[in-house]
Each structure stands twice: as structure tokens, then as C-alpha cells.
């Protein structure tokens, strides 16, 4: 997991998404392969997925490229590529591209883990039409599950926010989606966050909450 996370974090911190390449592929072919990542630090999903696969394979970790489609925040549908990694006996989706494209509530780049080791059910919230010969059914090695920030109830959310705000550092968490998850869960999270900030005090700091509503992941930043 640590090797995978190191590669993920390097990419998120160092590589920018090449929006221009989507408009003019013939003039930006490097962004569709590993060259764009290594030499230009600029790539689209195809180049990023190829780099992740090559690097993990070189380190002896089983990793594949998964092709499909994705739904953007503006509801536009695009062709997309990401990775599937094998950890122990289970397979997980990891989409470094969509973690690279994540900003916080102040439009600053953050190290996001929204798409770090997801099962089929969670990745399918905004990725679809992918066809692999195996299923991804586990969330055991999801980033937020490992960090103890995979929230399954309001009491746990209140405690996490209280502990996180007390530290005064940026942190993220994921809400566990079940058949009992209310439709207004995002409103509940925002309300609980505001109550926690008010109750715990700000210590002269500003706290911001950004959300990936399709994945029910949230990022708290300190201003």
C-alpha cells in the first residue's frame, strides 16, 4: 500500500492535467503517453494510467489499465482511463487522474484520495461502461478505511470532526454509503461540520469544507 500511495502522492503533487490536449490531440500527443508525465509533468488520463501501470508493474505489483466512461460535474460524459491494482487477493480501482483534478474550497490543489482503492459499487457512482474479467468487491484497502475515516454514523462523524479540528490541520473523510443513507446526507455533513466548528472554536483560523458528492468524500482545509 505504501508504494502505491507514494506513486499516487507524487503524481498528485507533481503532474498537471493537460486540458489543452483534449482540444488538440495532434499537437499534444506526448500527454497521451508516459513521455508527457516524465518530461513535461503534463498528461491526460491515458498517459497517467500508463505511467501508474508501468511503475507498479516494474515494482512487482499487478496493475492494469481500465477503460470506460466518466460523468463530469457538469453531467458531460467523456471517455476515460484509470487503473485497477491487485492487493493480496482483491482488486481495487484507483483513478489518479481524478485525484489530480481535485481542488479544495479555496481552489487550491490538494492531495485527494477520493479514488484511491475503490470497489465497483463506489467507482460506479461516476465511472461506467468498464468491462474487466474480474470484480472489485473490497474496500479494505481504501485510503479512508485504512486511516479510520470511513464514517458510518453521525456519532463517528462528530468525533472525527472534533479530533480533526483540534489538530488544526487539513484532513479528509468518506461517508459509507448504505441502503439506509439518507438522500440529504450532504446537508447533514455540512450542518454537522458547521456545528463542530462552532462548538470546538476556531482558534483564530478559518475552516473550509469541500465535497465530492458522488463519492461522499469531504476535505477540510485550514485557512
Model-derived features with residue positions:
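Secondary-structure boundary elements
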Residues: 1-37
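Extracytoplasmic/periplasmic, Sec-exported soluble proteins
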Residues: 2-3, 40-48, 75
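Acidic/polar residues at beta-strand termini and the immediately following turn/coil
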Residues: 18, 95, 210-214
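Short, well-ordered strand-loop elements centered on a beta-strand within folded domains, enriched
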Residues: 34-36, 40-42, 90-96
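Acidic, metal-dependent phosphodiester-chemistry machinery of nucleic-acid enzymes
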Residues: 35-39, 218-223
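Hydrophobic/aromatic-rich core segments of domains that either
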Residues: 47-122
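Low-complexity, Gly/Ser/Thr/Pro-rich intrinsically disordered linker/tail segments
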Residues: 105-213, 217-221
Amino acid at each position: 500500500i505504501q508504494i502505491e500511495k507514494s506513486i499516487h502522492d507524487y503524481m498528485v503533487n507533481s503532474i498537471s492535467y493537460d486540458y489543452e490536449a483534449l482540444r488538440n490531440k495532434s499537437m499534444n500527443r506526448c500527454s497521451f503517453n508516459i513521455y508527457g508525465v516524465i518530461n513535461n509533468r503534463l498528461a491526460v488520463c491515458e498517459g497517467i494510467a500508463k505511467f501508474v501501470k508501468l511503475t507498479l508493474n516494474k515494482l512487482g505489483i499487478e496493475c492494469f489499465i481500465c477503460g470506460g466512461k466518466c460523468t463530469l460535474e457538469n453531467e458531460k460524459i467523456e471517455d476515460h482511463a484509470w487503473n485497477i491494482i491487485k492487493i493480496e487477493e482483491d482488486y481495487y480501482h484507483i483513478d489518479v487522474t481524478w485525484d489530480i483534478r481535485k481542488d479544495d474550497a479555496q481552489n487550491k490543489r490538494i492531495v485527494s484520495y477520493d479514488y484511491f482503492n475503490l470497489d465497483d459499487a463506489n467507482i460506479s457512482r461516476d465511472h461506467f461502461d468498464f468491462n474487466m474479467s474480474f470484480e472489485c468487491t473490497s474496500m479494505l484497502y481504501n485510503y479512508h478505511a485504512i486511516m479510520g475515516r470511513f464514517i458510518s454514523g453521525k456519532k463517528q462523524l462528530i468525533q472525527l470532526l472534533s479530533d480533526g479540528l483540534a489538530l488544526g490541520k487539513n484532513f479528509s473523510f468518506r461517508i459509507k454509503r448504505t441502503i439506509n443513507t439518507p438522500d440529504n446526507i450532504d446537508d447533514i455533513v455540512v450542518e454537522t461540520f458547521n456545528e463542530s466548528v462552532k462548538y470546538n472554536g476556531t482558534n483564530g483560523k478559518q475552516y473550509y469544507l469541500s465535497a465530492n458528492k458522488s463519492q461522499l468524500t469531504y476535505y477540510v482545509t485550514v485557512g
